């Protein structure tokens, strides 16, 4: 039986940099400076027990609001049958959209959760700087053979043309080898510089910068912003505008996008008193690519589902799996030739009220235990008009997000 957790929390008058809190071995989930970071592990558990653990957290004093003071960082793997896993940190810093900041100490012994220790922890996080990164050499190699990937794309395209499925997402993986352990702190800083408006995360050696909001719950209000349909960005404004216009006009990409939006909308609607969505997709830009995106917002009926329940219902969306879900997933298992692990699942956080924010686990890497290897993933939606070598080029563009952050002298 796990001992009950306790928490001591205080507002921060001087904000802390969430990257500095995470450093290279902590926990991070942040977008545009808003999010959570943590250090240590007060408890690790799966989705079958996490809500009970959060609901039983006790405040050490009347200045601490336990349901708001503790969050669990979570990863939901791609495989639907695989449970999400969670970590509640010993030290948590929360930067909210309203500008408020707080720091919490979490543990099983309330006598150790004092205001004096909290002040010492804040001082340590504010003053400690990670060691400068070492000089590394790198090699990059495919894990999924290119021919295997191209064959899988053709198999998925043929299945769509036969009418077996509407869409399937086919992915591949590559590996980066480093002569020295990778410096996670520096990688996260590079991701912030290039992808600050993406959801940047690090949980147990799984890190990335996802541009796609799977679901966010704040009380009864929920939001989602699915992305599907991709074009490159060159840095030339004229060229990028032309590519964006071609993306919007592309029947292939509009079909791919519509499949995703319809699934997310139809999944959420029965649980909402209303659910609004943009009538037409818009362009969502990140550093090196641009996507078709459609924002949805609604209000949950009472009693509202938790963020975790919403994640379980939506994950994986057709943006990473396909449609119909079971048929597409069966095809992926048959032809893709790899175990995706956490790629294509979801990553985020949940609190004791059931609120949380979760991103689709893309533009990501899984580090080896010794941090000398990083496994990177990229994929694309396959429909009837998909061309295998164009899909291959799209995955290469998507790999660049993590490659440019990892492979540095």
Where are the regions that the model predicts?
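Contiguous alpha-helical scaffold segments within structured protein domains
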Residues: 1-12, 32-45, 110, 116-154, ...
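Extreme N-terminus nucleophile/cap motif
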Residues: 1-60, 164-165, 177-190, 194-196, ...
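A short glycine-rich, hydrophobically flanked beta-strand micro-motif that places a catalytic Asp/Glu
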Residues: 25-26, 71-76, 199-204, 340-348
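Short coil/turn segments at secondary-structure boundaries
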Residues: 31, 166-171, 201-204, 280, ...
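An anion-binding catalytic pocket shared by soluble metabolic enzymes
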Residues: 31-34, 38-45, 80-91, 172-255, ...
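Non-catalytic accessory segments adjacent to catalytic cores
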Residues: 52-176, 271-274, 407
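A residue-level signal for conserved active-site and pocket-lining positions in enzyme catalytic cores
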Residues: 74, 93, 163, 215, ...
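Conserved hydrophobic core element of enzyme catalytic domains
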Residues: 295-409
């Amino acid at each position: 039986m796990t001992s009950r957790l306790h928490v001591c929390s205080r507002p921060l008058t001087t904000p802390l940099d969430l990257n500095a809190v995470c450093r290279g071995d902590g926990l991070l989930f942040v977008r545009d400076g808003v999010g959570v970071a943590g250090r240590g592990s007060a408890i690790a558990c799966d989705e079958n027990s996490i809500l009970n653990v959060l609901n039983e957290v006790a405040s050490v004093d009347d200045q601490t609001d336990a349901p708001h003071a503790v969050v669990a960082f979570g990863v939901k793997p791609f495989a639907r049958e695989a449970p999400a896993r969670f970590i509640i940190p010993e030290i948590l810093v929360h930067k909210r959209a309203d500008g408020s900041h707080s720091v919490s100490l979490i543990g099983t012994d309330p006598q150790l959760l004092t205001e004096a220790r909290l002040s010492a922890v804040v001082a340590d996080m504010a003053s400690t700087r990670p060691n400068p990164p070492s000089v590394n050499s790198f090699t990059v190699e495919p894990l999924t053979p290119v021919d295997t990937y191209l064959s899988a794309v053709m198999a998925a395209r043929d299945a769509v043309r036969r009418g077996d499925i509407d869409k399937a997402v086919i992915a591949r993986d590559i590996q980066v080898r480093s002569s020295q352990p990778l410096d996670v702190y520096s990688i996260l800083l590079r991701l912030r510089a290039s992808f600050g408006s993406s959801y940047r995360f690090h949980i147990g050696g799984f890190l990335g910068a996802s541009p796609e909001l799977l679901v966010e719950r704040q009380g009864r209000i929920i939001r989602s912003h699915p992305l599907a349909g991709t074009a490159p960005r060159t840095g030339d404004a004229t060229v990028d505008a032309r590519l964006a216009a071609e993306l919007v006009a592309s029947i292939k990409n509009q079909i791919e996008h519509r499949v995703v939006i319809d699934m997310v909308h139809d999944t959420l609607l029965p649980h909402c008193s209303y659910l609004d969505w943009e009538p037409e997709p818009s362009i969502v830009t990140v550093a090196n690519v641009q996507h078709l995106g459609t924002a949805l917002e609604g209000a949950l009926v009472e009693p509202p589902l938790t963020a975790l329940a919403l994640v379980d219902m939506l994950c994986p969306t057709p943006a990473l799996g396909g449609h119909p879900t079971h048929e597409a997933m069966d095809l992926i298992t048959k032809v893709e030739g790899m175990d995706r692990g956490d790629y294509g699942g979801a990553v985020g956080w949940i609190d004791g009220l059931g609120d949380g924010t979760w991103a689709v686990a893309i533009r990501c890497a899984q580090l080896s235990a010794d941090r000398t290897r990083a496994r990177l993933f990229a994929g694309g939606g396959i429909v009837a008009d998909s061309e295998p070598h164009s899909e291959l080029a799209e995955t290469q563009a998507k790999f660049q997000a993590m490659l440019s952050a990892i492979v540095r002298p």
